[in-house]
Amino acid sequence: MAAIIPPCSVNGVTLTIRKFTARHFGIEDLIQAGTMERWVANQLENYVLARKNVLIAGGTGTGKTTLLNVLGKFIPPDERILLIEDTSEIHMDHHNLVRFEARQAQNGVPPVSIRDLLKAALRHRPDRIILGEIRGGEAFDLLQLLNTGHSGSLSTVHATSARQALSRFTSCVLQSGVDLPYRAIKANIGDSVNVVIQLERRPGKRFVSEVVQVIRYDADLDEYDFGAVYQCPQEKP
């Protein structure tokens, strides 16, 4: 829930409630809804089982959290998942799931940030780390975990394309204040993020518009090499 009161809200109190459905969607639900084709769904399942690091990108309301929930169902039940969120909103039914949630400073109790939780993550010996959303400097801590060989991670980011998703990741890493060359950060991202799934929303429909594999970062050209897996036809409504 988010609220703005006058004078900042000119026409009176503005209240926005984000209501979560009690129903937890599966991959078949997304296929039936036209979110993706079956072969794309099968490929995404293969990426999770192969422990690829997957980044889900899209604008507000495109279904990033829903897809993250669905992909989490493909994680084998014998693997230990560490789920880290700023605000708890991911509902994952898994036998060995550990949930961490950031905390704001309140009544003299110090805050616990996403960055704090990511730094503590390895002490809990997770097989997979799921970060609800990349928003700021915590991207650097996530990147460090991925660079240490922690495979099979999932996360989301606000972006309008797969290419912009990696640019956004880079910008968030820089927000951490880390003293690393720009191209070194991009090279680390190119080595660590394996797959980007782009989501879009049109009237009455949310769908996967693009799936790419990240091959590498070319420092000479200052660009990423992508392997196209799926591109939504332009005429998609």
What are the language-model segments listed below?
Residues 9, 23, 105-106, 217:
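Active-site/binding-pocket entry motifs
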